[in-house]
Amino acid sequence: MDLKESVTSSKEVPSSVLGSERRNVIDFYKTVRGGATVKVSASSPSLAAAAQSDSKQRRLLVDFPKGSGSNAQQPDLSKAVSLSMGLYMGETETKVMGNDLGFPQQGQISLPSGETDFRLLEESIANLSRSTSVPENPKNSASAVSGTPTEEFPKTQSDLSSEQENLKSQAGTNGGNVKFPPDQSTFDILKDLEFSSGSPGKERSESPWRPDLLMDESCLLSPLAGEDDPFLLEGNSNEDCKPLILPDTKPKIKDNGDGILSSSNSVPQPQVKIGKEDFIELCTPGVIKQEKLGPVYCQASFSGANIIGNKMSAISVHGVSTSGGQMYHYDMNTASLSQQQDQKPIFNVIPPIPVGSENWNRCQGSGEDNLTSLGTVNFPGRSVFSNGYSSPGLRPDVSSPPSSSSTTTGPPPKLCLVCSDELSGCHYGVLTCGSCKVFFKRAVEGQHNYLCAGRNDCIIDKIRRENCPACRYRKCLQAGMNLQARKTKKKIKGIQQATTGVSQNTSENPNKTIVPATLPQLTPTLVSLLEVIEPEVIHSGYDSTSPDSTWRIMTTLNMLGGRQVIAAVKWAKAIPGFKNLHLDDQMTLLQYSWMFLMAFALGWRSYKQSNGSLLCFAPDLIINEQRMSLPWMYDQCRYMLYVSSELKRLQVSYEEYLCMKTLLLLSSVPKEGLKSQELFDEIRMTYIKELGKAIVKREGNSSQNWQRFYQLTKLLDSLHEIVGNLLNICFKTFLDKTMNIEFPEMLAEIITNQLPKYSNGDIKKLLFHQK
């Protein structure tokens, strides 16, 4: 039977809810959606009969019998309710969360008032599986289905008459409680429809829940009245990341054959949570889908006819689906949406694209409808506009503000470490200007004894550097300027150039025999290796602005000595042949000679930088006569000045200094000897010969070579006494805790190990000359 004929056949079924007149329609789905208001007319015969009968019954029962007038099997109540809510529950053990919705017991729907809400939905669904069979007689269905007597809620005659008066006075409006006679207390809203026999889920084409049976010319069951409403057309939307939900449209038929009726999205739908793995479709429009983190894009496949043709296109912005036919998703892309029956949306995951601009260019949907241009949003009934940007955040007409770094033309100029003038280069081992270079050279070679008129703290800058030569010279020494640094650099550079030139000539003429003039030009000597491994000058970090005191100076000297000992250990390990000794022998030699190395290096720096008049412990710590006058300072400074004065008197060269310093490392041994004594004697003799070569190189083939060798070796022997006196002062300071002089950890360990050996006389001095 056709839909229109089944609905408009009022002669066959006079008491049907689905009447031919629109004013007699009861919006059953509005009740399911959350309200319970029943719109009736005062002239309705069924309602009039309901008002005059059954004064004892208080609740209105709506029954869904299993059989209809055409003997067609009716859908179950749980499915009907679920379909009207936009969801299907495969099992009856379902928990409904959200709004307070419920059904009464035994599959009954009670409408006690115009604003009835279903409070017993959960119990009703749970009891549906245990409900008894419903008789085919619709008139007796109320007593058969309901397990309780109808006289449970008696009413008086006065209450019935008052309700009848209220009903008549409120005809055509949402009135109060509506009563029905016992013969019409249950509404079989589907018994007048002629359906084919069998379950509605058996055949999709014969399903009684098809939307074409629910939509007629007068929009029978839809809250949206209107013949030209585009949302009442058939269609299937497959949205990016989420299916589109349209109100009162054709439901999606799932694989199990059960029809699902999409509900109107004018009322928020409840959330459904089940405990079993059943198929549930939750149609909840207006919910923002939580996207995964990361630049992953969803792409939907659209097929079939458009929802409304070319009249309206969906908007796609930021992952929100709305009820007005608009879809929102990422990337500002628009496309016409189409819908195909019995087909789920196809989602494709596009992998992340590295380049930001390519993400906009390559993100597109598949289907018959092509996407519009990038950054374009189309609204129905409006002209198309575009933002004109190829990528977000990049605007061609707006330039980024200039940064502060762009205004600078280049890196800041480097300054002289002495006077803060513009730097001209590296002079005597320090980055200085040309003026300070010339000043330092003249001050050292001229052997001037500058004196400061103030407190040796004059300001040295570009303007006032000529005011005090003493402070300027002191600042040059503190920066680390040394005349010998330039000579050493030239020598090392010459050796490298000679070696490179020989290798190039050999590669160009491999068959040519090269006869070197002298052997040292080809093979680096031990002296040249000693020049390379010589440790750099270490700064002390002494604060010259604070008042001087014995405690501050001696503590600073001890800390500086600890760092110099560490540098001396590295230097000793780099000496050719030293690492071949036994490890215990290496440690013993370093413990016995650390004060020799410190005192001799101090004398050399003082001799080269101040001509032996000052003690240059570090570039930032120079002991002058004023500081020498402090308590406990004069005695040890006097011994140290002796070394620098002897170097000045003998005019020791740098090669001679390097050889003598190595011999001082090998100048003291234990009385019982070393574990590798033979190797030690061989190494020591090798460097004695190197000292002779350095003397010959300086003096030439002269008769004074042996005399100079005697003078230099005599100086080495005299250092044993000088170092012995310095060690006595150091030991006394270390043992006297009242002075509160600090010692670094490594230096304290060496002194602790060395004290008993010196006190017992277990040290053997290796002298060149007998006394």
UniProtKB/Swiss-Prot annotation:
Specify the cross-link site (Glycyl lysine isopeptide (Lys-Gly) (interchain with G-Cter in SUMO)).
K273, K289, K697
Q: Report the subcellular localization.
A: Cytoplasm; Nucleus; Mitochondrion; Cytoplasm, Cytoskeleton, Spindle
User: How does it get modified post-translation?
Assistant: Acetylation by CLOCK reduces its binding to glucocorticoid response elements and its transcriptional activity. Increased proteasome-mediated degradation in response to glucocorticoids.
Which sites are covalently linked via Glycyl lysine isopeptide (Lys-Gly) (interchain with G-Cter in ubiquitin)? K414
Q: Which InterPro entries match?
A: Glcrtcd_rcpt, NHR-like_dom_sf, Nucl_hrmn_rcpt_lig-bd, Nuclear_hormone_rcpt_NR3, Nuclear_hrmn_rcpt, Znf_hrmn_rcpt, Znf_NHR/GATA
Give me the ranges of the annotated region Interaction with CRY1. Answer: 526-691
Q: Quick one: where's region Disordered? A: 129-184, 390-411
Q: Do you know which Pfam families this protein is assigned to?
A: GCR (PF02155), Hormone_recep (PF00104), zf-C4 (PF00105)
Which Gene Ontology cellular component terms are annotated?
A: centrosome; chromosome; cytoplasm; mitochondrion; nuclear speck; nucleus; spindle
* Single annotated GO MF: sequence-specific DNA binding
Q: Where is this cross-link: Glycyl lysine isopeptide (Lys-Gly) (interchain with G-Cter in SUMO2)?
A: K254, K273, K289
Give the multimer and partner information.
Heteromultimeric cytoplasmic complex with HSP90AA1, HSPA1A/HSPA1B, and FKBP5 or another immunophilin such as PPID, STIP1, or the immunophilin homolog PPP5C. Upon ligand binding FKBP5 dissociates from the complex and FKBP4 takes its place, thereby linking the complex to dynein and mediating transport to the nucleus, where the complex dissociates. Probably forms a complex composed of chaperones HSP90 and HSP70, co-chaperones CDC37, PPP5C, TSC1 and client protein TSC2, CDK4, AKT, RAF1 and NR3C1; this complex does not contain co-chaperones STIP1/HOP and PTGES3/p23. Directly interacts with UNC45A.
What PANTHER family does the record point to? KNIRPS-RELATED PROTEIN-RELATED (PTHR48092)
Instruction: Output this protein's name.
Output: Glucocorticoid receptor
- Origin organism is Cavia porcellus
Q: What is the lineage of its organism?
A: Eukaryota, Metazoa, Chordata, Craniata, Vertebrata
